[in-house]
């Protein structure tokens, strides 16, 4: 139990000798120290037992594309294909022969109202009618029905060429042309005018110290300086007088629980306990928060049995993006970011140490007069003086003046030091400190989003030849060699007996063309092809007979009255009779015969136009007139409905010979031809050299046992006779039936992976790419070697308060020293040498996880780590301020192809193409003519042993050959499609079978339209916005006498997009004089 309370402190005794170490104290309260440094790594523990099998993992990424499988067997014959696509539009044919007049067509539908006709010629003058009485003008009658239309006129002659039409609208922008070759380097221009001031350069390195200047005038008094280093501890002060005993204070409130103390030192290792019995299996616990450490890899399992071959899977999804490429070179430093927001206020610093003593204050007012001192002690009695002579008693004199001050006494002992003065008032703010050294680089920023896939690079230079590959499979049989020279004739052999009829010869050469077959059935109507170009005008056909009148058309506009016809011949002039009185009007007589024309009267004034008369009844159709001159072409009527197919045309002229078709399948072997007559015996030839040993022949059939003859003497070997003339060719056999479908072959094994080729020489350095996106943060590198100590930096700002230190051991009580003045701070000692490395300590128990330490300084960049998995793309950061103009970028990607232009007129026929590369060896040719008949054997009794020739195998082989060729070189037809979609390929031309006439130019990078906040308007030096329109588009320097427009460092073409878009384009400087 604690003592009730200490008594008053006694006087300090003399220093005793140090006591023996005390026993360990009781466990202290939980301390507040910072977490200790991490202990050294313990020795590896024993291997844990293998863990339970983990849950089934998520499906892995899609594997790489497998090697192509072996080609399958030919399938069964497919159904009849669909009608093929329409053929390409043919060139315009020549003018056709003049056709015969067609049959009368059916009446057409009423045409559109014709344009107003020209005035017709005046008709002949009619007979003069009898004069009628002038009746009163009747009211205008109703409009009569339109009269029947006249007969259509014959077609007019072809009109002359019309004037050129107005320029059509501009077509859509064509695709961007290939970049032209670089122009020749122009001559060096004369030096330009001086440019504007450049940007401020980077801060230069520190110069060497200059000569010391003359001492300056004393500056104004500075503000309080930064906190100085802690001074050395002063000597211990004298003991003060014992104070009076204080009153016991009240109990304080209960303190808050302290922070958890640091991990205590590990206790000694206990003895190993006995192994307990195995407990029962507990219930499955909840899933742990952290994944456990990886178990040791288990032993390799036994190979499982091969699973049955699964059906072919569906086409896999497009694989995920590949791993990010290697880390790009460090980008050039980015521009400074915008200033950050003001940080939160830091914690209050510790109280500063006492400032230096303030300046001496003004002199205080005089103090009040002191109190009278105590009466001094009586001094000692002086010696008795010698007796003076007796003076006269004088009168009492006046008081004399005060004596002068005595001499200065010796200096008294120093007084006790006064109490420390109050802190002086705060001084003015000091001058701004010099700029600090450049800070350490900040942590690497978060990786930006993955950049768009770059274009495929230029192909590297060809690598050196790789090592020789393994021997390939045996190639197909070569073409037959040329015939050897004719051997000399051998000696004539004895004539053999006539041989049996030989087996059928191979099919003969193609016979002459047979008589034309009968007319085939009418084929299905093909799809209508695209309209061909207009053919040249045919010769004019004979006018057809007039068709029946069409239905009544709509009323045309009333034509203008025709011009007056030519005057008729003047009639004989009659005698002018006297004018009689007007008699009553008789009934109108019949029209007399036409009288001779009277003289032409003077032209009367034009009367008012009368009302339109009623239309008379339609007269009978007159006889068909001759076909009139062709009228002007009317406007094209609407496209009529599609007519029925016409009767088949006459047989056309034979077309030009077609290209040679692919070899047809071999026909069945024809019946054997009749044996040719035996050739005459040739003269006996000289003995030939022995030939090379031939390949072993097939085993012949077993011959019948002959009677054993006597062994005759071996005669000399006869030379072979000259070949007999070949027999006549057999007829061509019929086409064999397709063979039965073969069984499915067993799958071939996967081919072995070829050896990797040697690394090719490094390609030339590519053009500088665009600035790459910042790479992902690499792993923290190893600590670099210890650097040399740098120069002393300027004093930093006061640091944050440190953690509370550990409690020190109790020091021995020092002797009482007098209080010294604070000494100046000593110079910083040099760093001591590194101590020897201690031995490895015993592994401590695993401590609790410490508090998170401060972020260490950024280490040197480590070696490039392995590429991590691609992280998910972070959100796009805000757009930074516009950086300075970058270097001249490479030419942009090709723009999107423009819309299809109108179909151009067919171009002139191009020159013949270059000779293509030699094609692959063709399929084996047709069998040659049959060779001469060999010597016969008598095999008459063994027909039952002969195998019929397997024609089905031949047909199957031939079909396989054709299908393999179609697989290797697909024709692009529906049965053998050629694939055009290869998004992983790079942009370029993709010819078909090495023929570039129909190559497609495909851009394999597709535009991602977006918006860039980079609309910059440039002003010239005369404060004019540079938004002029320049029309010169030539490569080279252009002279100008307006240097205010130069140099053009940028231009922004306008109206190249929507209303909310503007397109910018950076140019390099324009050369100018």
From Swiss-Prot:
GO molecular function terms listed in the Swiss-Prot or TrEMBL record: extracellular matrix structural constituent
Record keywords, A-Z: Collagen, Extracellular matrix, Secreted
Disulphide bridges, residue numbers: none
UniProt region (Disordered), positions on chain: 1-939
UniProt-annotated location(s): Secreted, Extracellular space, Extracellular matrix
Main location class: secreted
Domain Fibrillar collagen NC1: from-to ranges: 1039-1073
Biased composition (Pro residues): 217-227, 918-932
Basic and acidic residues biased stretches: 519-530, 837-851
Any one GO CC term of the record: extracellular space
SMART domains: COLFI (SM00038)
Recorded superkingdom: Eukaryota
Bias-annotated ranges (Low complexity): 100-148, 178-187, 194-215, 229-239, 296-315, 321-348, 386-399, 411-423, 458-468, 561-575, 584-597, 617-642, 653-680, 708-729, 758-774, 821-836, 857-876, 906-917
Residues spanning the signal sequence: none
Compositional bias (Gly residues): 246-255, 424-433, 481-508, 607-616, 745-757, 811-820
Family of this protein: Belongs to the fibrillar collagen family.
Identification of the protein by name: Collagen alpha-2(I) chain
